[in-house]
Amino acid sequence: MKVTLPEFERAGVMVVGDVMLDRYWYGPTSRISPEAPVPVVKVNTIEERPGGAANVAMNIASLGANARLVGLTGIDDAARALSKSLADVNVKCDFVSVPTHPTITKLRVLSRNQQLIRLDFEEGFEGVDPQPLHERINQALSSIGALVLSDYAKGALASVQQMIQLARKAGVPVLIDPKGTDFERYRGATLLTPNLSEFEAVVGKCKTEEEIVERGMKLIADYELSALLVTRSEQGMSLLQPGKAPLHMPTQAQEVYDVTGAGDTVIGVLAATLAAGNSLEEACFFANAAAGVVVGKLGTSTVSPIELENAVRGRADTGFGVMTEEELKLAVAAARKRGEKVVMTNGVFDILHAGHVSYLANARKLGDRLIVAVNSDASTKRLKGDSRPVNPLEQRMIVLGALEAVDWVVSFEEDTPQRLIAGILPDLLVKGGDYKPEEIAGSKEVWANGGEVLVLNFEDGCSTTNIIKKIQQDKKG
């Protein structure tokens, strides 16, 4: 099935809600403090990530949509760190600074993959004048296609009813990720997206899908909602709308590593898709696919257009398609648990031709999964000259990922993939051409790990260089 992604670049979305900064301090611990019976952590790594409503905005921006973020912060280093991090990923911030309050910050101390303690720096924003938030919403309504209200019960949405009315009066759909059991405050929203536990906290325990539908439809009527999307973890999602049959979508997640931030991804993709002009049903389809991707990543994550495109055509939803190196390592580990043989090859693959396709198909037949490592643009230029590559890296990877024979596509910056191969250690390393096995980059590492190295022949008469020469000759003629 050919599925076209929404035109995210024309979508404008405003996110209003509780913004926060997630700080992580990592380090080893090998002794107990003499001052108290607690471990001593020698901090060697510090990470800062936007959280709460800020993570929703990041998810929208990662799709290529225009994301604006409004929230309450203090006047402190955390607010500055948030603004910088978000600007780096093309989120336009318009924070309301509150000098009497700190920016909400959650500091986690971790050692050996264990969280030892979390320290929260926050004061409720409930008493803060909401008028500056309303003004920012009003100013943006003419240029956005959706408004997301991200509620973490920290006070930024104390006037949520007024915000809903402002948007609905302007004809802008309002999507809300709810918090708590008082859904009365969300009356009149276009769409609520509670997870199953949040939903059941309001309507009671549901033993069957029929009960979810019955109680969900009553909730829609009681609070004058246009729709309700219940996210149900491994059971997928259920979209309920008045006058329409329930739409139940099974989960697309093959491997679940971390559900952190999955709800932010869902509402972000929903909003961006609606703002691009797609229907609510289509938005749920893309959001479900995106959720299947993001839960396969570690930590709070976003989904790129390439990942989403792979997911909706049935590849990335099972951990396949264009990947980062870290994602590939996780996918390979999962494949090995399933007893699958992993084959790996590499090349520039600038202008894909019949020789490439035949070679990759033959390589795939030698195992259960095929990895194709692709030279970056800079690497290609160093190897092939200033006129190459003809096609940029992203396009080369998309084309390769579309081949049925190819399971995973990853890029590398170096002249050879030796470091990458040493990190992956495939069961079989394959290279096309006139090489001797010992001349192939990564062969020593693969052999040392008990793997195999094999040289395959390319199809005669097929060459990217020859194709380029013919094009140049035709232009001259």
Swiss-Prot record:
Q: Does the keyword Transferase apply?
A: yes
Q: What is the effect of changing E198D?
A: Loss of activity
Keyword line? Acetylation, ATP-binding, Carbohydrate metabolism, Kinase, Lipopolysaccharide biosynthesis, Multifunctional enzyme, Nucleotide-binding, Nucleotidyltransferase, Transferase
Outcome after substituting D264N: Loss of activity
- List, from the UniProt record, the residues annotated as the active site of this protein: D264
Q: Which CDD domains match?
A: RfaE_like
User: What single Pfam family name could you report for this chain, choosing any that match?
Assistant: PfkB
Chain spans, region Cytidylyltransferase: 344-477
Please write the reaction equations for the catalytic activity of this protein. Answer: D-glycero-beta-D-manno-heptose 7-phosphate + ATP = D-glycero-beta-D-manno-heptose 1,7-bisphosphate + ADP + H(+); D-glycero-beta-D-manno-heptose 1-phosphate + ATP + H(+) = ADP-D-glycero-beta-D-manno-heptose + diphosphate
Q: Where is this region: Ribokinase?
A: 1-318
Give any single GO term for biological process: ADP-L-glycero-beta-D-manno-heptose biosynthetic process
Q: Does the UniProt entry include the keyword Acetylation?
A: yes
Q: What class of enzyme is it?
A: transferase
Pathway per its UniProt entry is: Nucleotide-sugar biosynthesis; ADP-L-glycero-beta-D-manno-heptose biosynthesis; ADP-L-glycero-beta-D-manno-heptose from D-glycero-beta-D-manno-heptose 7-phosphate: step 1/4; Nucleotide-sugar biosynthesis; ADP-L-glycero-beta-D-manno-heptose biosynthesis; ADP-L-glycero-beta-D-manno-heptose from D-glycero-beta-D-manno-heptose 7-phosphate: step 3/4; Bacterial outer membrane biogenesis; LPS core biosynthesis
In short, the EC number is 2.7.1.167, 2.7.7.70
Any single GO molecular-function term of the entry would be: heptose-1-phosphate adenylyltransferase activity
Quaternary state and interactors: Homodimer.
Family statement = In the N-terminal section; belongs to the carbohydrate kinase PfkB family. In the C-terminal section; belongs to the cytidylyltransferase family.
Biological role stated in the UniProt entry: Catalyzes the ADP transfer from ATP to D-glycero-beta-D-manno-heptose 1-phosphate, yielding ADP-D-glycero-beta-D-manno-heptose.
Identify the PANTHER family for this entry: BIFUNCTIONAL PROTEIN HLDE (PTHR46969:SF1)
What protein am I looking at? Bifunctional protein HldE
Write down the species: Escherichia coli (strain K12)
> What broad taxonomic lineage does this protein's source fall under?
Bacteria, Pseudomonadati, Pseudomonadota, Gammaproteobacteria, Enterobacterales
